[in-house]
Amino acid sequence: MINSFIVIFLSFLIFINYANLVCVEATHVYGRRSHSNGMHGNGARRAVAVLRGDAGVSGIIYFQQGSGGSITTISGSVSGLTPGLHGFHVHQYGDQTNGCTSAGDHYNPFGKTHGGPNDRIKHIGDLGNIVAGANGVAEVYINSYDIKLRGPLSVIGHSLVVHANTDDLGQGTGNMREESLKTGNAGSRLACGVIGIAAVS
């Protein structure tokens, strides 16, 4: 009788120790998962796009969205540009097998026409223009409620593209009207990069 009790008691201790080990391992796995998803301790998420092109244009752009689906801040710089305005958009695909052409059209999950970033009717990927100074550098700082880093409309895995010309924000007229409602007449693609999850700093 005593021996049976001892066996049961030892079995119980072994079970408790095993359960504790499983909990510890689960905690470690969860921690690694959080870091790999670019999550900060406050629930913010961060992404990055490294822009490269054939015309000497390059840049690094960071995306950061707070917890709870709040506003996304887009910041960084692009160099090698001609002075002035340059169209700046998130495009459909994270594909650069044929250069920036492979990125496809503007990211437009709702099938709307092109517009400015503050317009009601626009593509999700319409970020308007960035402005390059006389030194060819554009300092980028954009706040957007449309750009998401989580959920079904996340831009992670899509491409960020900077264009040769000014985006007319869908306001083109005459023979420029049709293309204005598609691309903003922003011209060729100077540089692009896939938006990826950023390492947690």
From Swiss-Prot:
State the Pfam families in the record: Sod_Cu
Q: Name one GO molecular function term.
A: superoxide dismutase activity
The superkingdom of the source organism is: Eukaryota
Gene3D superfamilies from the UniProt entry:
Superoxide dismutase, copper/zinc binding domain
> What CDD domains does the database record attribute to this sequence?
Cu-Zn_Superoxide_Dismutase
- Annotated residues for binding of Cu cation: 89, 91, 106, 163
Its localization reads: Secreted, Extracellular space
Q: What is this protein called?
A: Extracellular superoxide dismutase [Cu-Zn]
